A protein has these predicted regions:
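Non-catalytic structural scaffold of enzyme domains
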Residues: 1-119
Length: 119
């Protein structure tokens, strides 16, 4: 079953975080038609969804298996960087650059910082 979740990535990007009523209501409505139909696993098709994996599991049912492709994406990125000879310079120091497809406003940057780094 393919299920379009048109609003979900945007909700995550706009700080509708785990366990909020808005997120729970959206997921409940989205997943209700598929509960108790014999579906045993859900494959997350977006890198955003890993942040709400537990919410999806709770909305669908505790027994469902959840698979995400994030580890595979990271492994592939690492492989490509190694193939191209691209590595972090030893004198680069600490820090991060966040590139995204939405907005560069301060609210979004704070949201990403909270999602990725917990602060």
């Amino acid at each position: 079953v393919n299920l379009a979740c048109n609003k979900l990535a945007g909700m995550i990007e706009h700080n509708v975080l785990s366990h909020s009523n808005e997120l729970q209501d959206y997921l409940a409505g989205l997943l209700a038609p598929y509960k108790n139909t014999g579906i045993q696993a859900i494959v997350l098709g977006c890198t955003h969804y890993v942040f709400i994996k537990e919410d999806i599991k709770e909305a669908f049912g505790e027994d469902v298996l959840i698979f995400d492709g994030n580890r595979g994406t990271v492994n592939r990125l690492k492989s490509v960087l190694e193939e191209k000879g691209i590595k972090r310079p030893s004198d680069a120091g600490k820090g991060a650059v966040i590139l995204n497809s939405s907005s560069d406003d301060q609210f979004s940057m704070k949201t990403y910082s909270k999602l990725f780094y917990g602060k």
